[in-house]
Amino acid sequence: MAKNNLGTITQVTGAVVDVKFEGELPSILSALETDNHGNRLVLEVAQHLGESVVRTIAMDSTEGLVRGQQVTSTGGPITVPVGPQVLGRIMNVIGEPVDERGPVVTAQRYPIHRQAPTFAEQATETEILVTGIKVIDLIAPYTKGGKVGLFGGAGVGKTVLIQELINNVAKGHGGYSVFAGVGERTREGNDLYHEMIDAGIIDLEGDKSKVALVYGQMNEPPGARARVALAGLTQAEYFRDEEGQDVLFFVDNIFRFTQAGSEVSALLGRIPSAVGYQPTLATDMGALQERITSTKKGSITSVQAIYVPADDLTDPAPAASFAHLDATTTLNRSIAELGIYPAVDPLDSTSRALDPLVVGEEHYKVAREVQRVLQTYKSLQDIIAILGMDELSEEDRLVVARARKIQRFLSQPFHVAEVFTGSPGKLVSLEDTIKGFKGLVEGEYDHLPEQAFYMVGNMAEAIEKAKKMAAEAA
């Protein structure tokens, strides 16, 4: 396709820019460049309108563009730098550094639009990824090379949970991570960067960094937010395919990817579908998700925070991502209101890996028994609210007492929340998690007060806390 093909801007409508070409038209998804008062502005071709005009989506602000301005076709899609040099750096959607630490110099650049691996290239074994977070490892374990959705409304702790996962996995697993910040708060992106420097995950002096960051935050135009997840994924694919790594790919927040698509969809003149979303919702989501997979060379394990508009899981945006997930971790506001963090709902979180053939018989039985006790407590809550605890049978009272202890034992102090809570974070081994909950459901700890189980790591700490409480009471 013709490189350096020149065109002129004919119309600017928000983030959508129409460009007229006299010669050959650039193909769909090609990158065009223009100069906007000294800044390089990249436009991506979205539609061909008639013989000589293309409709494009801008990757940055379009203020200052004028009709008649010259635009150059680059002859290919948007590319981003890939390789070990991107670790420890923050880039934007077009691969420019935004951390004020000089240019990112790499031997290669990859296009952000790439084909998903073929059937023959994919690997299918199931292996558990231990996170050190009790509720996740017990109830909805994550698999290597799997896709995990973190569902929750505003302010229930999705971002904190993602930060803890990055922290635990970088320490316990030592692999590389790529973090794509899609349409979230810039403050959180800045906090994450500084926390990673403090934790040693980003090494400013040497080359020990474990994570690459790609940001397209809330203040960015929708074009950048709709493409930044693809830019991050491209960097993760390099580590998987060229270096044979098991990579972790974090997206915060995948809903904003859909939201950005819906913002430009109307400007592109498409007829909206249900709830005003773009008609290509499932296609856009599939194109991103199908590239996140394990191949025979390495794997990409993806953790995606999914904002649920108005806490409605049937909304088309969260519903479109459900189909692609291997495990779901649902955060519940009513659990957060009890002060139990992480506010993961053990009855609403699922995993394909919670299968005796994958996790083993003991783990499976303990997890199901924990869910059974919590479900019984949930169904008794109406009776308790109306008639009180005294009207329950002896057996039901025991179930309620155990369920309340289990609920509290599912909470855990996080390393990344130390600055707010003052209590040091805990990383709990899978063995300790299973042992602790097995003892709880079998009634070994019926004599301990429920408050002893709140915000501790393993069972030994709960017993220690109970002794301390007894000593203080005496």
From Swiss-Prot:
CDD domains: ATP-synt_F1_beta_C, ATP-synt_F1_beta_N, F1-ATPase_beta_CD
Documented EC number(s): 7.1.2.2
Pfam families: ATP-synt_ab, ATP-synt_ab_N, ATP-synt_VA_C
Localization of this protein: Cell inner membrane
Binding of ATP, residues: G152, G153, A154, G155, V156, G157, K158, T159
A GO molecular-function annotation: ATP binding
Quaternary context: F-type ATPases have 2 components, CF(1) - the catalytic core - and CF(0) - the membrane proton channel. CF(1) has five subunits: alpha(3), beta(3), gamma(1), delta(1), epsilon(1). CF(0) has four main subunits: a(1), b(1), b'(1) and c(9-12).
Name used for this protein in its record: ATP synthase subunit beta
Record organism: Rhodospirillum rubrum
Lineage of the organism: Bacteria, Pseudomonadati, Pseudomonadota, Alphaproteobacteria, Rhodospirillales
UniProt gene name: atpD
